[in-house]
């Protein structure tokens, strides 16, 4: 249990590893679902093609959408795309990078499903059995004298072992279609692998600085959202604690005053210190209207990404070094006459 908890905490702290683990689980789940899936071809010319192609296309679409649902970055991408510009501009390249990253992970499980389905060949056999030329597999007398409708019904029963009478023709047709299906499966795997290789190989050929920039700011957007959520949780926790504490103080004020007279000064100091620390965590926001305004301003007008040093520190450093704003401040001793000069003492050890 402890190992599972440690692994879960690691995955939570490392978003990329967590999403890679989710993609791997989805890929294994898709293969396991197909192996446990009971394939039942309708063996009717009106429904064979729909059933076979639907089995090849619909589950991958479901896995693809499920990959988007399980990816936490989808909400981050949507919020970043729809948010007002405010004082922070939106970079389309960062949004494209986030969308491509989400799409790549979501395509893993559908690719596994399509590959397993094509390698198995059952859906391919069900979809294209009515297009076979039965004369290529011997015993063409089976379809002699049949109308076109009867011939289609006859060919549609090839995937169904219990409904098709001539076993040799059925086995030959099944092997033929499964051979084509497996060839398509290997071509699909080759195409997917070659595409991934091209993406890996071509990326360094372009401007690496632009790629690093988009990667950095996409990570920043994700981390900023997490830090904002954590800060809001801590603020809400402190706000609730102070609010409840004040409520009980107002309700039982006389009783608390009675106990305070009997308690020690150390306990009073500790309680005041705890209450002061909780109030400090509120960061000066102590009303519901103020908090709503802060949250609204965060959504409508996020602060610009331009961190500056404290003006007071810069000014003090300038006075100390005899410079102001990167230039000499004009005073011979590096300070004004009305500002007390700092004394420096140097001690030398003879040890």
Swiss-Prot record:
Locate the region Central pore. Answer: 9-36
Pull the Cytoplasmic topological domain ranges from the record: 1-20, 72-98, 204-351
Keywords associated with the record: Calcium, Calcium channel, Calcium transport, Cell membrane, Disulfide bond, Endoplasmic reticulum, Glycoprotein, Ion channel, Ion transport, Lipoprotein, Membrane, Palmitate, Transmembrane, Transmembrane helix, Transport
Record field: catalytic activity: ATP(in) = ATP(out); Ca(2+)(in) = Ca(2+)(out); Mg(2+)(in) = Mg(2+)(out); Na(+)(in) = Na(+)(out)
Where composition is biased (Basic and acidic residues), the residues are 263-281
Describe its assembly. Oligomerizes to form hexamers and octamers. Does not form gap junctions. Associates with CALHM3 as a pore-forming subunit in a hetero-hexameric channel complex.
The protein here is known as: Calcium homeostasis modulator 1
Q: Which organism is it from?
A: Oryzias latipes
